[in-house]
């Protein structure tokens, strides 16, 4: 695929609802809404070449929808034109919020990358939950505000290469799990997505808990997911078909297996595959020059695909690959090592995430920015 351009910017960066041509709110002109677009898109012109509606007062391209008061009350402005929208889906136990927090932390440590967390929600989330992550406690599900509008955790990551700017935006929204079709179908960001990441909990793979116990590997008890991972991919496909038809097939899908530290601790990894939780990392997808190693990436992806097939997730793999033209697989650990659990007492590992950025490296390569 070539570089992804989102033009015109036709959705609200907070609720991801489609913005009508003549009804939007300009945050630079507070109190003067709805604004009137000065350029009307021509339906006979291909989407990529239509004029973008501008604020008639200040000419800004930053637009927020008028359908939700909470959108207009947000001050932590997310980049108006993200280079790519990445939707992250999965069951509640897959750790989506933890994953997002660790991605932000990882980007913050990279040289030449500007990370601006303009939302107090990110700081509050870190203060309230980071120590719980380090203690391997089970976090509460992300909650909605009283006004029923999701809290937004956003950051800007601008990486310059060849005079190009790459902007990644992350939002964390509550209760948006993939096992309920009705709920999934209402996720507007899924239909704005240029890429989709589906997180799977290793401990919820069929028979995995029993396999770990057979090898005397203890793990924190968690509520079992009532439905199979196959339901998640079915619902994602169903929602995309409902909203986008055949266009949804072109969205690259990444399937990530979370909590891989347990697989390494139990010596369940494919031969020669290790992300470094219990030894040397043999699967780095970036070469010595910081470029994506396609050969290594494809090898890793095939090994994780085979791992899922061998652990009774063949239907999930087959359904994903029948619908999506591009499917990639990866394994990661937000903790970096499995916690020690004895007599119900959890001894936390050093918090050192591993391979959480792999799909983002692929995405940046896809956009010719890596």
Labelled PLM ranges:
Residues 318-340:
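Beta-strand-loop-alpha "switch" segments that mediate conformational coupling across diverse proteins
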Residues 76, 108-144:
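Flexible phosphate/Mg2+-sensing switch loops adjacent to catalytic phosphate-binding sites
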Residues 1-80:
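Long, basic/Gly/Ser/Thr-rich N-terminal segments
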Residues 186-288, 300-322:
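Conserved C-terminal guanine-recognition region of P-loop GTPase G domains, centered on the G4
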Residues 98-109:
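A conserved segment at the C-terminal end of the G1
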Residues 94-96:
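Conserved glycine(s) of the Walker
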Residues 86-88:
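Hydrophobic anchor at the beta1->P-loop junction of P-loop NTPases
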Residues 146-197, 203-211:
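Switch II of P-loop NTPase G domains
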């Amino acid at each position: 695929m070539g570089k992804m351009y989102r033009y015109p910017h036709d959705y609200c960066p907070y609720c991801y609802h489609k913005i009508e041509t003549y009804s939007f709110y300009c945050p630079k002109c507070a109190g003067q809404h709805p604004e009137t677009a000065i350029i009307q898109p021509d339906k006979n012109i291909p989407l990529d070449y239509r004029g973008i509606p501008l604020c008639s007062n200040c000419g800004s391209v930053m637009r927020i929808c008028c359908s939700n008061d909470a959108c207009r009350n947000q001050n932590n402005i997310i980049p108006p034109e993200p280079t790519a929208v990445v939707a992250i889906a999965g069951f509640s136990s897959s750790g989506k919020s933890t994953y997002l927090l660790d991605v932000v932390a990882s980007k913050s440590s990279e040289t030449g990358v500007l990370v601006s967390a303009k939302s107090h929600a990110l700081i509050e989330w870190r203060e309230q939950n980071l120590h719980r992550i380090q203690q391997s406690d089970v976090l509460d599900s992300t909650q909605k505000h009283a006004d029923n509008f999701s809290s937004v955790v956003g950051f800007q990551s601008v990486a310059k290469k060849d005079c190009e700017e790459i902007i990644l935006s992350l939002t964390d929204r509550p209760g948006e799990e993939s096992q309920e079709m009705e709920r999934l179908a209402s996720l507007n960001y899924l239909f704005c997505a240029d890429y989709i990441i589906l997180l799977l909990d290793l401990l919820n793979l069929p028979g995995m808990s029993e396999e770990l116990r057979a090898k005397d590997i203890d793990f924190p008890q968690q509520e079992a997911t009532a439905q199979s991972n196959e339901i998640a991919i079915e619902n994602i496909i169903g929602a995309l078909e409902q909203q986008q038809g055949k266009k949804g097939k072109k969205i690259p899908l990444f399937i990530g297996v979370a909590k891989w530290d347990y697989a390494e601790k139990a010596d369940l990894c494919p031969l020669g595959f290790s992300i470094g939780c219990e030894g040397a990392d043999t699967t780095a997808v970036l070469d010595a020059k910081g470029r994506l190693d396609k050969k290594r990436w494809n090898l890793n992806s095939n090994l994780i695909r085979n791992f899922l097939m061998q652990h009774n997730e063949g239907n999930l793999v087959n359904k994903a690959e029948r619908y999506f033209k591009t499917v990639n697989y990866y394994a990661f650990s937000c903790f970096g090592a499995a916690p020690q659990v004895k007599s119900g007492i959890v001894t936390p590992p050093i918090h050192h995430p591993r391979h959480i950025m792999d799909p983002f490296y692929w995405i940046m390569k896809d956009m010719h920015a890596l």
